[in-house]
Amino acid sequence: MATRCSHGDVPVASLSRLSRFGLAPFPLGFFSAGLVASYMSEFISHAARAEIEIQALEVQVDNLYGMEGSLLRGTMTGSALPVEATFRVKTTGTDAQNVQLAHLAVASSPADTLLRNAVDSVFTLNHNGTELPVTRVAASSRKQQLDPTAVFQAAQPGQTADFADNILQRLEGVDTLGGERLGTVRSAAVGLSDEQKRQVHVRGVGTLRTDGMKELQVACFQPIGSVFRFLSDDSAAVGGVERAPSGLVYLSAGLSFCFMTQLGRYAHVAKHAMHSYQIVQDTSFSPPAALNEKGETPTCAAVDTDVFIGNAEDPEKTQTLLNMGEQTCYLHAACRSGIKTRIRLG
């Protein structure tokens, strides 16, 4: 299974501006929503295989990230800590069976392979229409994709009749998530300073609706952020109706948004004369449990990203921009770190 995310022609730092003011979901929120949805899909598949009826299902994921160092000195580095997944379930199975289903859900989750496999992401770099060799980051072995500008110019809203309305929505007046009040620290900025030492706590909580859709609520728990609702459905290939994006789509979108945010942040702080940046990002996963009848260990390929930079800087500074974007990205850090998910039943 593969997902492709293409983004581009975004003014520097504008990706973070909407989320800064709570008007749109923040990049890490997409990733957490995708992780929750993936765990839920796997739990549902394993329960069906065991002929266990699900009467209620809620999955909570807590992600912790860190950022420390100086952008201008090249020491700033993003980091990701182990994920905590809490399953709150009511089924026709025993407590022991519910515990087993939770562990199977995480073990077979294609999304979780991205965390536990410790794989360096790979890149190509295009500078003002000319492909440059990458330096500190790992190089992609594939041919660089074409400039995605034409794709954006031709893009039109989909006309799928069954697609749900309001798949992304800010929830007004909500200040609790997972039964706890959001944290006590408010962030006054998005970190556009040279020196950083911060930790970010993101929480996502998903519930299974009676119509089979997954309703996900996600917030930056610390520092405090707005609560957003995501709707998710599985692809038709695994029994879904495709009424909303799948977990892997949200996960992949979060990765690309986070990376682009870091590119924009570095360009802003380093005062790069960058007028455009675009990416084409491919993520590939082995099939989920619904299609994995042999119970083979799930795998994923390295996140593969083509980066297109338009600027008035020299090639060396453009290569540094890519290096620092990858180095400070919370989610590329998660991919290369080999994170184990901690599981519990609530």
Place the predicted regions along the sequence by residue:
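Extended beta-strand/beta-hairpin segments
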Residues: 1-33, 44-253, 264-346
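Alpha-helical metal-binding/catalytic segments enriched in His/Glu/Asp
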Residues: 35-39, 258-259
